[in-house]
Amino acid sequence: MQPLTTLAEDERLLRDSVYEFADKEIRPLVREMDEHAKFAPALIDKLFALGVMGIEIPESYGGGGASFFHSVLAVEALSRVDPSIGVMVDVQNTLVINALLRWGSDEVKQRYLPKMATNLIGAYALSEAGSGSDAFALTTRAAECDGEWRLTGRKLWITNGNEAGLFIVFANVNPEAGYRGITAFLVERGFPGFSVGKKEDKLGIRASSTCELLFEDCRVPKANVLGEVGKGYKVAIETLNEGRIGIGAQMIGLAQGALDHTIAYTRERKQFGKAIGEFQAVQHQIARAATDIEAARLLVYNAARLRDAKLPFLTEAAMCKIFSSEVAERTASLAVNLFGGNGFVKEYPVEKLYRDAKIGQIYEGTSNLQLQTIAKNIMG
């Protein structure tokens, strides 16, 4: 029996190679990308070349043919250096590509998956101004007209909105039917009536774009319905469950990165004639953080392996997301504390991680909603 955090050889090689790439190619650009709130374009090309943007796409479509667990390892390794990069790769794989693999027709898969393995970024458009946690209260509408669909509405908080060329958009074709009218559509950036609006100026994960999407009688071919008409709620629920594991991976990567910086700093920073890492109080705080991270990693890895084994993982996904998000915030806060004044300035890396950590308790299902999910599943 293999322990949860003991990786197979191919898993270890993937994690190490992705982290090596992140350390060499991403780390020198982190501060600049954060300040300008924009990814370096050349870096996106390198991520495609590395293979992480289509890691789960079958080899027959030009992808890596790897497992969901492999994508989780990649997100963790990238987020250890920059959680903004981690979430871009996460949305691409755990939300968009997974939805295409599960619900896309053969024609849809052939049309989009080879591009998503090479140069096409995806986004997932569910949230609206009045439907955040209450996702199925969405007001974007779709109506049949002249042999196609016409979408009208507005989406908010859409990750990858600035870079994406393909969007999974949820709209209601029959509002009287409630959530049973919700349908998932594949919208290309160039479709008539579609535009990307305001880009949000965020507290953290600033390089990752978060945008408004506008649909003004947007024309969508009938072939671009993902799954069945009226079954979009199922697409949304099931992909978000997987996405929560991806956010858990992002958060443990962030926490590990913060701890890495903290250990290195406390070995070098001297007060009262010795390194502050020699003081027992500091050592105990670091030991507790390391314990938290390992516990969070166990939860994330367990949820991911359950998903790959086709076993129920809804409760475990909620558990791993809420706990990993809390651990990330605690660890980043500890890093700022132990860096002292240096932790409060942009010259040092931990203030950014502190800002980045907060989003983990908000997106892809707030912590309160995760608690509700866990309670419902264990209490009935």
Task: Show where each model-derived region lies.
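Alpha-helical interface subdomain recognition
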Residues: 1-91, 103-108, 118-119, 132-135, ...
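Short Ser/Thr-interspersed hydrophobic loop/turn segments at strand-loop and sheet-helix junctions
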Residues: 51, 75-79, 171, 187-192, ...
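Helix-loop "lid/cap" segments that line or gate small-molecule binding pockets
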Residues: 95-102
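A short, Trp-centered hydrophobic/proline-enriched beta-strand micro-motif
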Residues: 118-127
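Short Gly/Pro-enriched turn/cap motifs at secondary-structure boundaries
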Residues: 130-133, 157-160, 173-176, 202-209
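Flexible, small-/acidic-enriched active-site or ligand-binding loops
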Residues: 137-139, 190-221
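A short core secondary-structure module
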Residues: 148, 152-196
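A short, charged helix-loop
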Residues: 211-238
